[in-house]
Amino acid sequence: MSANLKYLSLGILVFQTTSLVLTMRYSRTLKEEGPRYLSSTAVVVAEFLKIMACIFLVYKDSKCSVRTLNRVLHDEILNKPMETLKLAIPSGIYTLQNNLLYVALSNLDAATYQVTYQLKILTTALFSVSMLGKKLGMYQWLSLVILMAGVAFVQWPSDSQELNSKDLSTGSQFVGLMAVLIACFSSGFAGVYFEKILKETKQSVWIRNIQLGFFGSIFGLMGVYVYDGELVSKNGFFQGYNQLTWIVVVLQALGGLVIAAVIKYADNILKGFATSLSIILSTIISYFWLQDFVPTSVFFLGAILVIAATFLYGYDPKPAGNPTKA
């Protein structure tokens, strides 16, 4: 059953990540009259939606009893303040990471951003080894190297992308690069920290997500006030929101739930591989839908390497002797 949940959650993550990349790219490049929606408010709204979804799931687990729901929330959150406070650290880092990625996408071309952001897989592996004591075998370390090479091939910029990158100033490229590098390290640390909390305590993944979303909303609102306070007071919190914006926000909220399930039933490194597969899928779809990418032989080589690395990571050679030895 756990194996089925593992691959089901990974499959949903690939779908969610692919859809989010395509819709977010389209929403940020679509030319419209009036102000564009603020990314800082989108992060906050996504956190609120995630909290609402998790409360509903806890309600469902409580046999649709409001009284049981209130008791569970009171016992697991209010009566365990130290357990709740544990989520403040990863929540703050996740909020910072979400805002950094908007900064990165505003200052880097898509190819450079996506290649560089895959460094989070390596940082996740290193934090998993150091914080969780996870043992990676030779095949798993090799798969990480192959994955990095494959993603680099997949996102190798074409001539048109190189020309577009020249339009970006050196300063903005440096800002974008620093943003995505910090996001890579924060993603690795926060993801492994959250995994450690989930697997060492008995609280459900939905309760943990409510706690995570609570702090995320607070940190997110602080970010809105500091960076976009004037714009919000002038044009409103939901300025620039349209149907596409709400799709992006819902997909972001869904992503938090799916990632939590992946961390619970799989692990952070498999989450990274699923994200890499979604990059290939989103690039292919963008060729047919957005028509802004032409696949090359280098792309197909990279796709093969990423898929091979995914299977290699899951390869578990059985020892010839001492089968009962831990």
Swiss-Prot record:
Its main location: Golgi. It is found in: Golgi apparatus membrane. It is a multi-pass membrane protein. GO terms for molecular function: antiporter activity; UDP-galactose transmembrane transporter activity. O-Glcnacylation regulates the stability of SLC35A3 and the specific complex formation with MGAT4B. GO terms for biological process: transmembrane transport; UDP-N-acetylglucosamine transmembrane transport. The keyword Repressor does not apply. It catalyses: UMP(out) + UDP-N-acetyl-alpha-D-glucosamine(in) = UMP(in) + UDP-N-acetyl-alpha-D-glucosamine(out). Keywords: Antiport, Golgi apparatus, Membrane, Sugar transport, Transmembrane, Transmembrane helix, Transport. InterPro entries: Nuc_sug_transpt (IPR007271). The chain crosses the membrane at residues 4-24, 38-58, 136-156, 174-194, 212-232, 243-263, 269-289, 293-313. The keyword Hydrolase does not apply. One of its GO terms (cellular component) is Golgi apparatus. NCBIfam families: nst (TIGR00803). Belongs to the nucleotide-sugar transporter family. SLC35A subfamily. Interacts with SLC35A2; the interaction is reduced in the presence of SLC35A4. Found in a complex with SLC35A2 and SLC35A4. Interacts with MGAT4B. Transports diphosphate-N-acetylglucosamine (UDP-GlcNAc) from the cytosol into the lumen of the Golgi apparatus, functioning as an antiporter that exchanges UDP-N-acetyl-alpha-D-glucosamine for UMP. May supply UDP-GlcNAc as substrate for Golgi-resident glycosyltransferases that generate highly branched, multiantennary complex N-glycans and keratan sulfate. However, the exact role of SLC35A3 still needs to be elucidated, it could be a member of a catalytically more efficient multiprotein complex rather than function independently as a single transporter. This is UDP-N-acetylglucosamine transporter. The lineage of its organism: Eukaryota, Metazoa, Chordata, Craniata, Vertebrata.
